């Protein structure tokens, strides 16, 4: 890091040195990205070493603290049916860069490194404000840089740390331990200060937020807080989040970004699904000797629906259909080969159907498949300067159907080896078949 300081001073002071780089040049952004990426790798190494040492000291298995996208939907399906209220919140952004520097100051004791961090923040601010039009510079500004992802994860960690601490202290149930995270010297300093000033204040806060049935789930910049408590308790948590972001991060957080809904009556949007809790009536006939009677029971069931309006809107922006959902040809792909066109359409169709395989209404998936299949046929017909009817008559409609349903047949065979149910029952079952490696770009996770 100290050797990089000479490069930064050379770039900023071009009159003293013969090494001058223009801020809009390719080399300038290349070196700026290399410095930031290297700085991010160094920070990740230091933070990961502290995390591993903390895990070894506390002897906590790492597997208990791993949470993936594959476990979110089964968790919601198992827990939401027994809870009452859900709080839908968006993590506020963007945060002022100087606040991040002050937060990292308790971790980084090297003063030149903090100055380097401020310089990198300043360069990113200038890069985002210029809106460059050159392709060489646009490549660096469009990439999801590792350093920015590290800062985002660290910011989210700071937001969730105090919440996890209060959640653990105010509950007698087993929860994710907050001690496995990185130690914070200034946080415990504040706790000691509060203990000296007022011994009962912290206990009052814990009693103020006490709830033994509360769950927190976050994916990217959106999170949900689900509880079995009352509406008053959810409003208390809302008040806590608003004041926390306002006084700790100096960020004015609008209260309307946290929406509290009652699960049996409303639905909420999370991870590309509209989720709600439905009442499922069940009638059971009970026979006791000569008397028989009926027992009516109500069970709660999590209902997840793929948002067809948002999916069609995404397909419309990608020029696969109109705003109303009418398929159109993809004109910019007509210069590709037939196999490449089919491969691109089928890959998009597979990703969408995989991600939304847990939808309770399969008609949405059938409509998306219809749009992509007909858009593919229109694109191929436009390339060969023919009509869709003539093109399909020449190749046969079974060709496209077999190509699109190849993934579904392979998926059915995989599950048939484990669960012996009929093929026609597969369409009615919800299978959370999520593929992180091939996550589609058309799903809006915000």
UniProtKB/Swiss-Prot annotation:
This protein's UniProt keywords: Chloroplast, mRNA processing, Plastid, RNA-binding, tRNA processing
Assigned protein family: Belongs to the intron maturase 2 family. MatK subfamily.
Superkingdom, taxonomy of origin: Eukaryota
Subcellular location: Plastid, Chloroplast
Chain coiled-coil ranges: none
Name listed for the protein in its UniProt record: Maturase K
InterPro entries per UniProt: Domain_X (IPR024937), Maturase_MatK (IPR002866), Maturase_MatK_N (IPR024942)
A GO molecular-function annotation: RNA binding
Role noted for this protein: Usually encoded in the trnK tRNA gene intron. Probably assists in splicing its own and other chloroplast group II introns.
PANTHER family found in the cross-reference section: MATURASE K
Cellular component GO terms, alphabetical: chloroplast
Origin species: Phalaenopsis aphrodite subsp. formosana
An example Gene Ontology biological process: tRNA processing
